[in-house]
Amino acid sequence: MACFRVILYLSVIFFVQCVFAAPKGITKVAPENHNFFGRITSYAHPKDVPDPVPMYQQFAALAQQSNCHNYHINISVGDATLLYSWGDNDRNQRLQLFHSKSLGIVASWAGMNPTKINSILGAADVFLVDVDRRYFPHAEKGAKLYKGFQDAYKRVAPTFIKELQYYQELYNEDRVSLTGLSYGAALANIALLHVKKNLKRGSIYRTVAFGLPRVGNQEWANSIDKHADGKFFYVANGNDLVVRAPPRELGYQHPSGQIWINPSNSSNWKFYPGQENVHGANSEFGYSIPDHTGVYFRTEIASLWGHCPATVGKD
């Protein structure tokens, strides 16, 4: 049954994307937004990334580090020190908290563990369900989330918020940042609204998610845009399959904030304003798993097979 769910999920993604695939190299001149099955699509032209590249490199290294099986508290990754780790990276995705000189207290979640069935099943539980208002009371009316991701976040949420508040006080730190790869990127996305509601001090400095799948519907994407205050970014590398899944045709929608590295693993990156920008990753039809676990801002994020400990800007 477990294998069937995974196979069905991947088959649906492939079929729907083949049927509705956008043509390569969109050049249409149109208003900034138009409707796609009632959802927003941006035609805004790309811009330079809004922050210094070293900031994204530090985020990328911390997104990689939470995937490492061998680690110890107080390990250094760039300008950050590991403070806390939780989860078995099977039923519970590994969460790690760092103190970074440039980013504040950083929460990083590991990506899906392909060697553990519960991690795979959580990622395959793809149905959209209503947001749990106990955690997300400020989400827009009608907001829905990917069931497997919401369930995974709810398991870690009480511990996460408690430890986050503790380390903010311990380090007298007002900045909070969120990151992760893949499954972990989805949890960083979901955490944003819950963290903002529960902060006792400070604010969310940045959220930078790598290889982010679509996590919710249009109303969830709108909620991220509203509450992120322009500080949420997700990075797509080349033809990464995961960033294109689940398909929009199933009701899913990315929020604003895409940075697209194209070609993959290169130093050519641009910021694509608005939701589901046609000039960004959606403009090319292709599926690549190697691009998912690739090089982001000259920093490898390769899950179990990447640098451990993670390195910053050396790839």
UniProtKB/Swiss-Prot annotation:
Residues 1-21 form the signal peptide. The active site is at residues 182, 240, 292. GO terms for molecular function: hydrolase activity; metal ion binding. It catalyses: a monoacylglycerol + H2O = glycerol + a fatty acid + H(+); a diacylglycerol + H2O = a monoacylglycerol + a fatty acid + H(+). GO terms for cellular component: extracellular region. The keyword Metal-binding applies. CDD domains: Lipase. InterPro entries: AB_hydrolase_fold (IPR029058), Fungal_lipase-type (IPR002921), Sec_MonoDiacylglyc_Lipase (IPR051218). It is found in: Secreted. Keywords: Disulfide bond, Glycoprotein, Hydrolase, Lipid degradation, Lipid metabolism, Metal-binding, Secreted, Signal. Disulfide bonds join 68-308. SUPFAM superfamilies: alpha/beta-Hydrolases. Its EC number is 3.1.1.-. Glycans are attached at residues 74, 265. Its main location: secreted. It is an enzyme of class 3 (hydrolase). The keyword Metal-binding applies. One of its GO terms (biological process) is lipid catabolic process. Secreted lipase involved in Dandruff and seborrheic dermatitis (D/SD) probably via lipase-mediated breakdown of sebaceous lipids and release of irritating free fatty acids. Shows activity against monoglyceride and diglyceride substrates and generates free oleic acid from the substrates mono- and diolein. Able to cleave the oleic acid from both the 1 and the 2 position of the glycerol backbone as 1,2 isomers of diolein were converted into oleic acid and glycerol. Belongs to the AB hydrolase superfamily. Lipase family. Class 3 subfamily. This is Secreted mono- and diacylglycerol lipase LIP2.
